[in-house]
Amino acid sequence: MVHGIPSGYELKEGDIISVDCGVILNGWYGDSAYTFAVGEVKPEIIRLMEYTRASLEAGVREAVAGNRIGDISCAVQSKAESGGYSVVRTLVGHGI
């Protein structure tokens, strides 16, 4: 879940947390999220985080003039699937 509900939960060793920030400055809109590991995490979590980042980077490489959204999403999905993962198909994407 990207957008959690505030609670009294205290982070502990092995947790991961996603920080999602947006900004509007001088007519420009930005949005970014990053996942942080809290202390030592399990190897499978590290692997997931590595593939997530690599999938993002694959998509960014395809975000060039002349390409379409499908080119970007294909690169993301291909990288994720190469690691045995899948992509979320609902509740994704938004405009800024």
Label each region the model flagged.
Residues 1-96:
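Active-site neighborhoods and metal-handling regions in enzymes and metal-associated proteins
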